[in-house]
């Protein structure tokens, strides 16, 4: 998970320590409903995790921690979910211009996050040796739910307009339209200044 270090400060991870997998999934679902960018990806990710949360509730996941052999795989699953939360939360708090520039990289991180969470879930289930037809069916349904993450079409249009401007189209108009939606109460110059300041912070972190 080291490649995700630039998603947030370690203090953000520390704040999530102590929450079990079901509670972490609830946080992700809540955060996904308020994101500004990658809305479709965030909500697909959250919907997939809701399937997992339902299965974990059936397993009484908080009780599984009592067993020594379950602690490490559960901790790995929870760690992957914490990073998943930071990924979703970054689509709310980060600079619009930064997220736009990193569009396909963020898409890749959603794919990686889902893959890692599913792998750790599978490990937890293998260790429990659950012989229950309903749970097996739920797991198969989760595995079939392979979400297609992609760069939102509207955001891609803005990125294309800025990086490869059409002589017939003024990129400023495209950007102005988008920023007016993100900052409905601010004049364009102030909104652009706010995004520029956020972008500077992101570049310093990178």
For the regions a language model picked out, list residue spans one by one.
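Alpha-helical bundle protein-protein interaction modules that mediate dimerization/oligomerization
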Residues: 71-204
